Regions:
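Carbohydrate-binding surfaces of carbohydrate-active enzymes
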Residues: 1-306
Length: 306
């Protein structure tokens, strides 16, 4: 629900990056919803460029391309302003699981790197956008509890003054802790025909004190799994008479994620072809948008984006 979404970009890229990299990152950011760019950095003293690259008319590499780049970005974000995202998938932001794991004590990892070992929401988001070409929206669990969201005919509906979005699938990233009130809303979504895909680790503890048994009961009612016991080694599924479906994938990969989404949302509102399915010369397609294939990051490094 952000009409303007800003992002600082290009900071700490190689000093000798070419002008085409300006466009590559711009396209990646726009595909992810950014419509306000803050290029880094425009140094007043070209002899004191502490963090490359220099993005200004003084740069011999980038300076000649900046006027066309500025026109391109200006036109593109003008088209994106005021638009409405159309996507079938909501991805729950696992803030309660991240917060429950973190501790302020000597010996713990640096701030931003202290994440639970099962943490996978950044991996899921990278696969969805960069490789599976499935658009999605992060949903904050506290907002999900309120009146911004409602459930109608198997859809989770976000309806505000700025936008309206209707989700048919809610993905739960791995995590042991969740708000009981959030899980109640998720159960309502399932009971009214919604589709749920859980990955890696089901919640077993409540973000609120003294309500763990409610979490256990709700997870059992949705997935038919007791989360206090070891997670099932194989994929499990559940369904109800209202059309609700829930799938738990214990060891999620790109392929198991793609397959599960196809089962739960067989006819998406928008379908973007996979690179492998596009009928074009291989050398014209380039690589996937995602960072994980070319730059494998540890869970700790991925946690820096939390």
């Amino acid at each position: 629900d952000r009409p303007v979404t800003a992002a600082e970009c290009y900071g700490n890229y190689p000093a000798d990056m070419d002008s085409l990299m300006l466009y590559r990152l711009a396209m990646e950011l726009m595909a992810r919803g950014v419509n306000f760019f803050v290029p880094h950095g425009m140094w007043y003293d070209t002899e004191q460029v502490k963090i490359p690259p220099l993005i200004s008319h003084d740069s011999k590499l980038l300076g000649p391309a900046l006027h066309r780049y500025s026109d391109y970005v200006g036109r593109s974000v003008a088209l994106l302003d005021g638009g409405r995202r159309v996507t079938d998938i909501a991805l729950l932001y696992p803030i309660h699981s991240l917060e429950a794991w973190h501790g302020f004590m000597p010996g713990r990892p640096d701030t931003g790197k202290d994440v639970p070992p099962e943490n996978n929401y950044n991996t899921l988001s990278d696969w969805l956008t960069g490789e599976l070409r499935q658009d999605f929206t992060f949903v904050h669990p506290e907002l999900l509890q309120g009146n911004l969201y409602s459930v109608h005919d198997g859809r989770l509906v976000l309806n505000t003054r700025q936008t309206r979005q209707e989700y048919r699938l809610l993905i739960l990233p791995a995590g042991k802790v969740i708000s009981t009130e959030t899980l109640k809303r998720i159960k309502e979504f399932y009971d009214k025909g919604g589709r749920i895909l859980a990955t890696g680790q089901l919640p077993v503890q409540s973000a609120e004190f003294g309500r763990d048994t409610e979490i256990t009961a709700l997870i059992g009612q949705i997935f038919g799994i007791d989360p206090t016991r070891p997670m099932p080694a194989k994929e499990t599924s559940a369904a109800n008479k209202q059309g609700g479906r829930a799938i738990f994938v214990p060891a999620v990969t790109r392929e198991t994620l793609r397959t599960a989404i196809a089962r739960l949302v067989p006819s998406p509102d928008v379908r973007i072809p996979l690179l492998a399915d596009m009928k074009a010369p291989a050398d014209s397609l380039g690589g996937p948008l995602g960072v994980l294939r070319d730059h494998p990051l540890t869970p700790e490094m991925l946690g820096m984006f939390s």
